[in-house]
Design a protein with these regions (language model features):
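Conserved N-terminal alpha-helix of the aminotransferase class I/II PLP-enzyme fold
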Residues: 63-96
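A glycine-/small-polar-enriched, mobile loop at the entrance of the PLP active site in fold-type I
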Residues: 36-39, 54-73
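PLP-dependent class I/II
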Residues: 3, 11-13, 18, 25-32, ...
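Generic structural signal for well-ordered alpha-helical scaffold segments
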Residues: 23, 77, 81, 107-108
Length: 388
């Protein structure tokens, strides 16, 4: 089969590849602790499940409007005002099956040969993949351990050229766990305002999972709502990964183009999932708060545990549920550490270079697992590292 050349530009998520290797070892009888997948280990809150079940019984089993059911778009707009302090109209909301389609559609709508897109590196690997697929040029914005994985904003203007059309932000950040402060977002906004045709895609999927600060959105800065596409969803905050539901909040001029891309690809998100999402946003938030409280305990457990292992350094994550320790002093590449920790220690984790060139020398561990399993993983990794 002769494939289109553009398929060579499409990357992947190695988390699922590592998961497959781990499952194969488990099938052979090896005990594996899973710290590779970025998925909450909690069930969807019961009132959300009940709303979804009732929606199915009430006949929400048909096509819905491509940009989303009116009741969900209205709920998202209300929630955005409450959480972000941004006056949002339902007409500026587009709902999709998962948040990735919003990323893809935005890059297909704005990216093309000759256009440059700035993105965080280390960062979610699909950013770079989608930028390349759109034909645009990926321009990495390095996140360094020495600054707690925050970008050096004094260098940002030097990355921007006349061809730069989009800057991708992710806060809290995957894989590093850093969270952009209000002051940092103000500085970015001031830089962006100096350029006429420059936009922000703000990935805020982890906005509810924070430990050291409240959530700040760059769209709330003066003059930035019309320059910002917010990307969010329900998978992380409400443990709804399998419900496949995300959304974008965007300038009105972009909505018809993103909607047309959705018409040509997914048609619409599942109607019953959307009714469940209304219950998620407008129902009790106790389960979310309890989940974040538990993640905070695990964050301390894993970061302190990793720092207790010889020659490993791990900055304290500020948000999300990932630790991103340095293994530079161990004499192994990130990929070698990933492979050997799986086979020799029985701990599944991800090589840092899966998140971009600046991730070499690091690994990512998800602490979306029990305290008991995290402690066992630390003990296994400690033994493995001491054996090197």
């Amino acid at each position: 089969m002769t494939l289109a050349n553009r398929m060579m530009n499409l990357g992947t998520e190695t988390a699922f590849e590592v998961l497959a290797k781990a499952r194969a070892l488990e099938a052979q009888g090896q005990d594996i602790i899973h710290l590779e997948i970025g998925e909450p280990d909690f069930g969807t809150p019961q009132h959300i499940v009940d709303a979804g079940v009732n929606a199915l019984r009430d006949g929400y089993t048909h096509y819905g409007p491509t940009p989303g059911l009116p009741e969900l778009r209205e709920a998202i707009a209300r929630n955005s005002q409450l959480v972000r302090g941004i006056k949002t109209e339902p007409e500026n909301v587009v709902v999709t099956p998962g948040a990735k389609p919003i990323m893809f559609y935005v890059l297909l709508a704005l990216g093309e040969p000759g256009v440059e897109v700035i993105y965080p590196n280390p960062g979610f690997p699909i950013y770079e993949s989608m930028i390349k697929f759109s034909g645009a040029v990926p321009v990495p914005m390095q996140l360094q351990e020495e600054t707690g994985y925050h970008p050096d904003l004094d260098l940002l203007p030097s990355l921007i050229t006349n061809n730069t059309r989009l800057i991708i932000l992710n806060s809290p950040e995957n894989p590093c766990g850093s969270n952009l402060s209000h002051a940092e977002l103000e500085k970015i906004a001031n830089i962006v305002r100096q350029h006429q045709n420059l936009y922000i895609m703000s990935d805020e999927i982890y906005k509810d999972i924070l430990y050291t600060d409240s959530h700040n959105s760059i769209a709330a800065m003066p003059g930035m709502s019309e320059r910002t596409i917010i990307l969010d969803g329900f998978s992380k905050s409400y443990a709804m990964t399998g419900w496949r539901l995300g959304y974008g909040i965007m300038p009105s001029e972009l909505v018809p183009h993103i909607t047309r891309l959705a018409v040509n690809s997914v048609s619409c998100a599942a109607s019953f999932s959307q009714i469940a999402a209304v219950a998620a946003l407008e129902g009790p938030q106790d389960d979310v708060e309890a989940m974040v409280t538990e993640f905070a305990i695990r964050r301390t457990l894993i970061s302190e545990g990793l720092r207790s292992i010889p020659n490993i350094n791990c900055p304290e994550p500020e948000g999300a549920f990932y630790a991103f320790p340095s293994i530079k002093n161990l004499g192994l590449t990130s990929s070698e550490f990933e492979d050997r920790s799986l086979r020799e220690a029985g701990v599944a984790l991800l090589a840092g270079n899966a998140f971009g060139e600046f991730g070499e020398g690091y690994v990512r561990l998800s602490y979306a697992n029990s305290q008991e399993n995290i402690q066992k993983a630390i003990e296994r990794l400690d033994k493995f590292v001491r054996s090197l």
